[in-house]
Regions:
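Short beta-strand
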Residues: 56, 74, 106-110
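Catalytic cores and adjacent binding grooves of peptidoglycan-active enzymes
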Residues: 85-143
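Short, polar loop/linker segments at the starts of domains and inter-domain junctions
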Residues: 23-27, 69, 127-130
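Acidic, His- and aromatic-enriched active-site or binding-groove loops in soluble protein domains
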Residues: 71-92
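Generic non-transmembrane alpha-helical segments
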Residues: 39-50, 92, 96-101
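Structural recognition of the beta-strand scaffold that forms the well-ordered cores
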Residues: 53-55, 80-84, 116-118
Length: 143
């Protein structure tokens, strides 16, 4: 196992149920996954060291296409993770991240099932701090 941080491994951030497709990041994507793992450690601390379950992080083009996501998805470059936190709702996780001083690029409550968190694709870019909701009504600003 390749440990990226104390609590997150490369295998965890590249896991996919679509095993028929290769899901191996290149060196740039691995560097992004390291930054993402460091960010997830901060989220974990923010949430009182609660366990974070990663549903999806890095996605190769084939995996991304298989799940029906856009080519511009930050998952494609290793800068996004869809997470669940046992004992917390996605709304609670989203609110906690928004209220914090964490430098997130996006936080999205998706279908009340998970929280999408991302960091800037370029480590030198300023985080956009976009807070959104995606559900059957569409995409809108978090309020």
């Amino acid at each position: 196992m390749t440990q990226l941080t104390n609590n997150f491994t490369l295998e965890e951030l590249t896991h996919t149920d679509h095993r028929e497709y290769e899901n191996v990041p290149n060196e740039t994507e691995k560097a992004n996954l390291m930054r993402l793992a460091e960010f997830l450690e901060l989220v974990k601390q923010l949430l009182g060291n609660a366990p974070i379950m990663v549903n999806s992080a890095f996605r190769s083009k084939q995996v991304n296409d298989a799940v029906g996501s856009k080519d511009t998805s930050q998952h494609r470059v290793g800068c996004a993770a869809d997470i669940r936190v046992p004992g917390m709702t996605p709304d609670q996780v989203t609110k906690a991240i928004i209220a914090s001083d964490l430098q997130f690029d996006q936080v999205i409550r998706e279908f009340d099932r998970w929280t999408h968190v991302s960091i800037p694709n370029n480590p030198y870019d300023k985080p956009r701090k976009m807070a959104l909701i995606i559900d059957k009504q569409g995409t809108r600003k978090y309020s």
